[in-house]
């Protein structure tokens, strides 16, 4: 039997714990062994635990924590016994615990988790030092002792013997087991092999995804039946088909409370629009002189109107005159135009400001458009025009509310709990992926496949943001259960902290992957030789070091370490080649953006002008350094043999260029065009790149030491902690599932509810104890196992003659371990909250909203906070977060009189009118009036009505977007959605009706079969926005329902059936969106590229604010708790940046007339910002773990106590933000790069100097014992994060320069010169002014 112990959730069943006397345990063990049970043991030294029985479907089994690294093979561990490392195999197991695997699983789900009557006692066996492979074979023969043990009952899968008279038959294809296996396989989205746009199908084929589809499908089918029935069709009026369209636009897919609130606002806005149209109709009638119907018809007859059939009576004749446009007059049309303009502008403004009110505003706009298109035709006061749309809309809204209440109803409490379950499952899966990642070598190809961890973290953050919208309605509804909304929110808040801590794991993967990419065996050897040679032969400071006058302080700038460029006498071919190897890898070493991330000029040939990489520019810019002091005036392109200056562009005289010389003899216009097409931007960031190169030459250039061994040790030491964390999350998920399904079971038995609550509480406490003990053992000794590979290096004194071996890999692993411990602490806080809630809420009850509303009002009146803030840490210095800065008006002082105040208010009001959003609102109102002009003219009103021009008006209003990219995207999606929707509508119509005019039973059956698939697309299909799915489904419904309406309850105009309706629908939609598309470019298009660039610049300002708040947080007297306000800002900013990344795909729809839009640079910039935000949050988390003296040492070491260095960081962020917002270029000389000044303090990089006056002196030299200090571990993690923060700020400046360019050229910058400049500026350098190589890491 292999050493596989912990079954997964699907295979776990009937785990039992017992702690009885040794005699009873021995007899139980003998009986279980005799019955043929198989035993698998794990090591444990836990105290005795109460008996426990876990049945299938309930909480998962509990993993016993161990003191040493165990070989516990779980379902989420990818390593097996045969591939364990020797270090892991040499460890012994103490106090093994026996797992009993029985023959029959529990067939049913039971909520009674503890059944002492069925508990069996298995004795614990003595521990032996043995390999994991021998653990299983000796487990059943060892003697018993008093200890704790676990029992798992799993069905036996032993094969039958060959002479068995009844051999096992292969199950048929339609067997129950085979169908279940196929169903589980198809539930996996990866098994479908679908393109990304269709991955929503398998992801939503579950209970959570199908419930809203079933509810919405029944809702639409009922609405279709109302159209088919003659009586209801007639009652709904001439626009009865709007019933089905409304059921598509607003499907019954949301919980009860949001649906009720949206319905309330829908009625409010809809009837407000109707009241506005009634007022317009009254004023238009007054402008006509308030004529009667008879007088109006007589006037039409006098003007030449002839009734087609006078025998039909007066009503028929007046209706024909109205819809032929005989009563359209200029003054009433102007009144209707003004009212339409104002109403459309108002509802568009509300729609943009409050996205949840999207469809209520859309319905109000439709009501206004219907009234404005038909109102000018009526010569008398007719207030029922708006009711043509309001009546079917209100009827369908009532049906939607009924379906929401009675067909698979769902409360916000239930929906929020379901999202918490999803959050728990995804977090558990993320931790399982971590164990898989650590089992692979970074050098293998599998390591890069774990780059998807970043997307998983993004999905977790998006889920948190979705929960925030549901959180608003938790206490606004009636719900029945054990927990109320505030209790669930308290769990979600701790989950938010935990997920932000898990973001560090994805950065760890990228960091390791980056280090493995920049180090290869061939170049490491050459670069290492060049590095040592550079250290031994460079006697003086470099120019870059001498020019860092803006460093930490004046005393530090005088003793800045040398950069170690090429030796002064390095004129041999070997030193030049070694220097070239360093330069070739320099831009990669510190993660400088390369490969088309900078706009560069081409030096090889004109055809390569736009594709020269940043690395090539760096090498060319540094080429003069190799030539020593004899070529100090070499130009940037000295690498080429000859150069020719043509304007501002350096053109090398290469053969490829000379072959194109004849093209310059073309006519002047064509020649200019050719040269303009071949011309590219000049290089940017050359000065920063050279400083990075110098820093790379100075730092030890060594491959990460023992990286594979460190990760192997990390996997073994953290395996037990990962297992316990995953088990705890599985238990939490089962507890949440139980909470959601335990609402009406045994509703009248409080005794059973309390007993079940005690059982649940006992089990959660067991998981809490096991996880807390595993974390304690990990913090005490296991987290320091990774230092063992470095023990021999610290004992070898010869190694430090040139440099100390880089501890970069160790600090990166420390970074991982620190965040792992922080994440586990977050899980423990969640379990603590669950235990507290289980103790306070053992019985189900009815939660009603009036108490929450009353308490909220009382808290606002008294100034006390509600229950939402009871767990928030109230810091005594929270006033420090209040900003003491504010912007000023450079053109005026603060208002000092009533005249100034009134003038200030008026100026602010007029400025607000011409804001971009308000200008767009006025633009949409103008477009609505322009599209309605044919209805305002007497000659075209009848034609416009007969050809359904109203559809074009509605589509034009809805298609015009604020930015050009959105308008182009909407144009394409509406065209394709209308086309395919019309085809589907015709298929449904002709399938149900054949060649006839419509069969009610056939259409009801076909629509009933098709509507679930249509609603599935409507609910779940998203291509950047849900709009394509809405257009597709609405067009299909309109084609079918309007065809039925035209033949069974025809109005004044009948379009036909099937094809006639479909193609008219397509033409009107195409006409409306084409008008909107053209109008979007008038008078001046507002591009999405500008909006995205400005928003990215705004996020940089927010990052600077978070930087300052964390700096203030670190200087507080009490910093043991994370500031929830800062963490909320971090999460909101992360969601904003993530939405900007998704917004970049929308910008691709915008045409680029001046050149290709550099999308990859914006993606890199957003990704860098997202990483920087996560790093700042990680730094705040690390600050909470440090003692005061270590925290002071950290802030001093990383420069956060130096206002000049902090000012430079904020200046870089502000300059980059201002350049992106305005599009202006940046100076060539900026405070960046900041990384070189990060390494300018004396002493070791990861040890703070000069703190002997601290209460407990901190060591100043790196020692092996220091690596066993938890405070130093957190200190090293803080230094690692601080370096990453500075590096990311530098990268932001580099990318911004590549986008905006540079100005203020500094010619002949001293850093470009050779070492003669060093002797001119710094003739002597004392030894204490330099940094010795062994101080560098």
Curated annotation (Swiss-Prot):
GO cellular component annotations of the record:
endoplasmic reticulum; membrane
Membrane-spanning segments = 209-229, 241-261, 267-287, 328-348, 361-381, 387-407, 917-937, 975-995, 997-1017, 1021-1041, 1066-1086, 1275-1295
A Pfam family for this UniProt protein? FUSC_2
Database matches in InterPro entries = ArAE_2_N, BRE4-related_DUF2421, Memb_transporter_dom
Locations listed in the record = Membrane
Q: Where does the record place Polar residues bias?
A: 80-94, 626-644
How this chain sits in the membrane, per its record, is:
Multi-pass membrane protein
Q: Where is the composition biased (Low complexity)?
A: 18-37, 68-79, 123-147
- From the UniProt annotation, give the residues forming the signal peptide: none
Which top-rank group of organisms is this from? Eukaryota
- Which keywords are on file for this protein? Membrane, Transmembrane, Transmembrane helix
Q: Region Disordered: start and end of each range?
A: 1-94, 119-174, 623-662, 868-894
UniProt lists compositionally biased (Basic and acidic residues) regions at 157-167, 868-880
Q: What is this protein called?
A: Uncharacterized protein C57A7.05
Species the sequence originates in: Schizosaccharomyces pombe (strain 972 / ATCC 24843) (Fission yeast)
Biological classification of the source: Eukaryota, Fungi, Dikarya, Ascomycota, Taphrinomycotina
